[in-house]
């Protein structure tokens, strides 16, 4: 059974994407900082007959992210699909934020994605297979000064994806992002649509691999 690891598993795109892969027979591992909320999501999945486990992770802490991936690889044998969905959404301009919150936001919004990608590619490279899915944002295309730390983070997600796409493809790893350019509520048609796009990216044959899809298109 293949394993899908979600980092930053919220009730919107995180849950919808995990459920989409669960329908295809994946073992799901949901992870976030708040284990109570994550367990509720896992219970919803189990009620539908899906396999779902819960882990706690601090996406701002590189050691926490790397330890999570190593634990999942040891327990289930592999991480076949990684979905990095963690984000710190703070409405504040650069001048309104103290240095500590800027760095904290960036640690979640891009730092955790960098660490997760680096950690998971080692075993994926040995297998010459794997998918890394990153939740992007329209702020990477049109930055907003009122959400400056998120804008920088989503720009980083896009750069990480496009900057590693070809090199990872040569190792059999598909890294891709859905650049989400609208607000997405839990249990919404939009969340389901984004999940479907992530599944589409994962399902592409290697000669059709793409790095980015924008939603809505």
Locations of the language-model features?
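C-terminal helical subdomain
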Residues: 170-217
């Amino acid at each position: 059974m293949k394993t899908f690891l979600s980092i930053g598993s919220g009730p919107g795109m995180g849950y919808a994407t995990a459920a989409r892969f669960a329908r295809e027979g994946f073992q799901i591992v949901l992870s976030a900082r708040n284990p109570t909320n994550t367990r509720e999501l896992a219970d919803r999945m189990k009620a539908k007959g899906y396999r779902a486990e819960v882990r706690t992770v601090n996406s701002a802490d590189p050691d926490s992210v790397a330890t999570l991936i190593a634990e999942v690889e040891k327990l289930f044998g592999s991480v076949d699909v990684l979905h990095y969905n963690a984000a710190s959404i703070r409405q504040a301009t650069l001048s309104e934020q103290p240095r500590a919150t800027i760095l904290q936001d960036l640690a979640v919004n891009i730092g955790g994605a960098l660490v997760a990608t680096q950690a998971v590619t080692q075993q994926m490279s040995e297998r010459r297979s794997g998918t890394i899915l990153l939740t992007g944002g329209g702020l990477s295309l049109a930055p907003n000064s009122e959400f400056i730390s998120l804008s920088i983070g989503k720009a980083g997600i896009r750069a990480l994806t496009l900057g590693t796409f070809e090199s990872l493809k040569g190792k059999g790893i598909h890294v891709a992002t859905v650049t989400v350019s609208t607000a997405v509520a839990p249990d919404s048609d939009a969340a389901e649509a984004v999940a479907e796009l992530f599944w589409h990216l994962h399902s592409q044959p290697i000669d059709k691999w793409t790095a980015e899809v924008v939603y809505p298109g």
